[in-house]
Amino acid sequence: MAGCCSVLGSFLFEYDTPRIVLIRSRKVGLMNRAVQLLILAYVIGWVFVWEKGYQETDSVVSSVTTKAKGVAVTNTSQLGFRIWDVADYVIPAQEENSLFIMTNMIVTVNQTQSTCPEIPDKTSICNSDADCTPGSVDTHSSGVATGRCVPFNESVKTCEVAAWCPVENDVGVPTPAFLKAAENFTLLVKNNIWYPKFNFSKRNILPNITTSYLKSCIYNAQTDPFCPIFRLGTIVEDAGHSFQEMAVEGGIMGIQIKWDCNLDRAASLCLPRYSFRRLDTRDLEHNVSPGYNFRFAKYYRDLAGKEQRTLTKAYGIRFDIIVFGKAGKFDIIPTMINVGSGLALLGVATVLCDVIVLYCMKKKYYYRDKKYKYVEDYEQGLSGEMNQ
């Protein structure tokens, strides 16, 4: 019991402190100061200046709306003379953070539900009714086979199908693009951002932008970098691609808006930065199913009341608006945490110098003797004194 009390008393009433040994050595002294300077440079330069370790940060919350403008004219044997405006080529009218502009199409007009020959391919070409299976259908069929082999043209016969007739023939994509004039259409992007932690909000239509300016400006990275109206051709070209080539089979473009705001400075300096890149893979060596397309139909009835439709396979460019960024503002908590971390890192210099002095230098045993006071020797000294 007495032994336990003695140990407890030693724990409670004794204080241990490190022993400081001053070593006069140019090599060790210079190395110690060099390591300390490197650590200070890292803490001040990287942590506080570059990474702004004295700030609390927050991620952006964003909403985006878009509006396209532009008119095109086409004159074809199938559709005749036609004017195309926003209601014709923006499909659908509204999407979340994106916009689709139709640039090319394959149109099949006046389709009705009836029977007609299938488009020729390796599964539909036939010589007689025996080559056609009634009721058969697969994922590439235009309809359900009737079991009859009928002429597709003067030289080819195909299996007849019950479908929307005449069936769509999408073997060849029109080149150049049907709406090649879309290169000069414009896109207005309205972006509102909010940093909830700091209750800070802003939009990309800056306070100094007037109505008259907004009607005339077009984004240019050098001369007009904050105009929110973009020419479609410029978006694609700035991403390193040709609009006319992309318009043929379609694709996906990303409009990136970066908001990095230092809220310790004036709010007017929190500005959007725009960049563009193509998001769909364009690999010429592995060019299977390229581009972007989908189908839609417009239904109506003829004079006799029979239902008809016009089927459109639309090729075009989908513009995805991607908003990202962060804001920072001074806060005492991250500041103190990083200051404490920096002070703790300074201890690395001492540890490194101790390793070199005690294990690498020629006088390592001499320095060890000065650095450490061994407990065994001390106890033996006390015993000797008591025996005397």
UniProtKB/Swiss-Prot annotation:
Extracellular-facing ranges: 55-338
Disulfide bonds: C116-C165, C126-C149, C132-C159, C217-C227, C261-C270
Gene Ontology process terms (BP): apoptotic signaling pathway; behavioral response to pain; calcium ion transmembrane transport; calcium ion transport; cellular response to ATP; cellular response to zinc ion; excitatory postsynaptic potential; inorganic cation transmembrane transport
Binding, ATP: K67, K69, T186, L188, N293, R295, K313
Topology of this chain in the membrane: Multi-pass membrane protein
MF-aspect GO terms: ATP binding; ATP-gated ion channel activity; cadherin binding; copper ion binding; extracellularly ATP-gated monoatomic cation channel activity; identical protein binding; ligand-gated calcium channel activity; ligand-gated monoatomic cation channel activity
Tissue: Widespread distribution in the brain. Strongly expressed in microglial cells. Also expressed in epithelial cells.
Regulation: Activated by ATP. pH-dependent and inhibited by acidic pH.
Key word Zinc present: no
Keywords: ATP-binding, Cell membrane, Disulfide bond, Glycoprotein, Ion channel, Ion transport, Ligand-gated ion channel, Lysosome, Membrane, Nucleotide-binding, Receptor, Transmembrane, Transmembrane helix, Transport
GO CC, alphabetical: apical part of cell; axon; cell body; cell junction; dendrite; dendritic spine; glutamatergic synapse; lysosomal membrane
Mutagenesis / variant outcome for changing K67A: Decreased cation transport
Membrane topology (Cytoplasmic): 1-33, 360-388
Induction field: By nerve injury.
Keyword Transcription regulation on entry: no
Residues annotated as transmembrane: 34-54, 339-359
Localization, UniProt: Cell membrane; Lysosome membrane
Function of the protein: ATP-gated nonselective transmembrane cation channel permeable to potassium, sodium and calcium. CTP, but not GTP or UTP, functions as a weak affinity agonist for P2RX4. Activated by extracellularly released ATP, it plays multiple role in immunity and central nervous system physiology. Plays a key role in initial steps of T-cell activation and Ca(2+) microdomain formation. Also participates in basal T-cell activity without TCR/CD3 stimulation. Promotes the differentiation and activation of Th17 cells via expression of retinoic acid-related orphan receptor C/RORC.
Summary of subunit composition and partner proteins: Functional P2RXs are organized as homomeric and heteromeric trimers. Forms heterotrimer with P2RX1. Interacts with P2RX7 (via C-terminus); this interaction is functional only in the presence of ATP. Forms heterotrimer with P2RX4; functional differences between homomeric P2RX4 and P2RX4/6 heterotrimer are minor. Interacts with AP1M2.
Family the entry assigns: Belongs to the P2X receptor family.
Protein name: P2X purinoceptor 4
Source organism per UniProt: Rattus norvegicus (Rat)
